[in-house]
């Protein structure tokens, strides 16, 4: 079974020639939406969906505009509105050291330097300067951890475990 990873949401059509407007959540739009790239359009990663091949890609305002081979009019792509775009696992590129895909981080257990479990990462917020990892602490307020060297000490993706240093002021409870 192939694993599929979300790279964007089809928010609307654009024009009448089969172009779709995509709100991307990938750091690699040029790679993901390159001509000839195969994507899955579906409501969820488990859904069967429709495989499409990218014919063209351009940016417009804060959106990526795509056309797909075989889809030449607004009527043919209207049904994709509200769906998500997914890439298969074999299309993921190798990342540099200390770079991770969101799916590798979300769900990891977070422990402090003494090994005390703090919770699990449930979301990642992009701030511009650095990402912020949201830790679900059950019955407590979420802990927001900036992804910076001074806080994140070790990431073990294979064991889904992250060791952190809680700087003064990070945990108000």
UniProtKB/Swiss-Prot annotation:
It holds the Pfam family PRC_RimM. The keyword rRNA processing applies. Keywords: Chaperone, Cytoplasm, Ribosome biogenesis, rRNA processing. Disulfide bonds: none annotated. One of its GO terms (molecular function) is ribosome binding. It is found in: Cytoplasm. GO terms for cellular component: cytoplasm; ribosome. The keyword rRNA processing applies. SUPFAM superfamilies: PRC-barrel domain, Translation proteins. GO terms for biological process: ribosomal small subunit biogenesis; rRNA processing. Residues 97-170 form the PRC barrel domain. The PRC barrel domain binds ribosomal protein uS19. Binds ribosomal protein uS19. An accessory protein needed during the final step in the assembly of 30S ribosomal subunit, possibly for assembly of the head region. Essential for efficient processing of 16S rRNA. May be needed both before and after RbfA during the maturation of 16S rRNA. It has affinity for free ribosomal 30S subunits but not for 70S ribosomes. PANTHER family: RIBOSOME MATURATION FACTOR RIMM (PTHR33692:SF1). Belongs to the RimM family. This is Ribosome maturation factor RimM. It comes from Shouchella clausii (strain KSM-K16). The lineage of its organism: Bacteria, Bacillati, Bacillota, Bacilli, Bacillales.
């Amino acid at each position: 079974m192939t694993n599929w990873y979300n790279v964007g949401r089809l928010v609307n059509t654009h024009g009448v020639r089969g172009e779709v407007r995509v709100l991307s959540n990938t750091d690699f739009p040029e790679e993901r939406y390159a001509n000839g790239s195969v994507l899955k359009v579906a409501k969820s990663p488990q859904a069967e969906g429709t495989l499409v091949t990218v014919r063209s890609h351009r940016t417009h305002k804060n959106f990526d505009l795509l056309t797909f081979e075989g889809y030449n009019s607004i009527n043919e792509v209207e049904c994709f509105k509200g769906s998500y775009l997914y890439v298969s696992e074999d299309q993921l590129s190798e990342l540099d050291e200390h770079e991770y895909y969101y799916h590798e981080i979300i769900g990891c257990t977070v422990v402090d330097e003494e090994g005390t479990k703090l919770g699990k990462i449930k979301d990642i917020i992009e701030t511009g300067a650095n990402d912020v990892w949201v830790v679900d602490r059950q019955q407590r307020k979420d802990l927001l951890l900036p992804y910076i060297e001074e806080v994140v000490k070790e990431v073990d993706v294979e064991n889904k475990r992250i060791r952190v240093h809680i700087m003064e002021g990070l945990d108000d409870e």
